[in-house]
Amino acid sequence: MATDHSGTATAKALIRLAGPAAWARRIAQFAQIAAAGPHVRRAVVQRHGLELSLDRIAKGAVRVPSAAERRVLDLARETVSVYATLPPAGRERLRALLHACLADDGTLIPLFHLMRTAALQRDRGFSVAFTGLAEGTPFDLLLERDGVQAEVACDVVSAEDGRGVHRGAWVRLMDRVDPDLQTWLANHPGRYLLKLTLPQGLRRDAADQDLLAALHDRIRTMLSAQRRADHDEAAVLRLDPLMLAGAQAGELGLLNSLRQEFGHEAHLAVTECGGGVFVMAARAGRENEVAVAIRRRMAAVAPARLSGTRPGILAMFIEDTDRAEWRHLRERLELEGEARQFLTFPEARSVVAVTCTSRLELFGATAPDGVPEGELRFRNPSHPSAKAVALAPAVLSSV
């Protein structure tokens, strides 16, 4: 068989598992969603980069895959290989998982997180069985090394669950507001900064669509009336001149400067028209609690997914985060603190270790953006198997 240097055959094989018609519909859905505006379009490309990359590769649009694309292809190849080893019921479960990944707001992350977790443990000397797929066990993987077994439950948690202002809602607001800002700049040349504080938050669910429309109307009314401030219990808005040094004039320099001023939690957007610049910076009324949301998810997953008859490992994938936030969670020890707190809870009785990873590690990012060894690990010192030598490569704390 010819070597698949471009990855085309691998990508096509995964698409055949999904069903070519279902895959084509999914790619078409991305185009429909992206038509909402440029901010939503960028968000779609970022969130669904796995699917879009595989689609381009399958169509022969990528002659030489990048390092990140090669990692994606490795996971696609692993998926196809695992499918071939499964019994009929297991193959149906894998197809069902793949179809769920391609439905609604889903991505391939749950499937690829499972495959990547298995590959990491094999590289550490464990034999790995896909019992969740093959047998329908609540946990996903059964590890064994030197006669000692451990269960692994893989789960994906969105950083949005810990944010007061969802990025998904923010990009939709920006696409609503951007034409108004263009008009404003055309009639009022200059540099402006609109700061928004949203005490009640802004989420992407249907319940907040009315709030999104109301906030858009308030911004438009504020600009048309040339007011500098507006506030109520839902939002505090303030319009100020934007002060720029020479080095900050470009969009990249401006965003870096604003990020330093407002912090990693701020939602930022820049609109330009002619020589005018309009910046919007939004924050919730309280600090984000991403690490807290992860801890709550772990407390829900552990008793539901681990049998309690063997040492259990929770393999958590942190989705919808970025470089700045991921580094903040690690460097400020927020993630470590919440993980270690969880390990003291009754729900963690069967958990010997927790691992955490993100897209940065999946795509091969190195320190300081990515985590060495591909994941953070936190061992539960109170678990009876915490010091088991056979389990050490999978459970020893990485920090």
What are these regions (language model features)?
Residues 1-124, 132, 156-399:
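Charged, structured surface patches that assemble and position nucleic-acid processing machinery
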Residues 136-153:
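Short acidic loop-to-beta-strand element that houses the catalytic metal-binding Asp/Glu
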Residues 129-136:
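A short glycine-rich beta-strand->turn/loop micro-motif centered on a GG-aromatic cluster
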Residues 120-127, 145-148:
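Secondary-structure boundary elements
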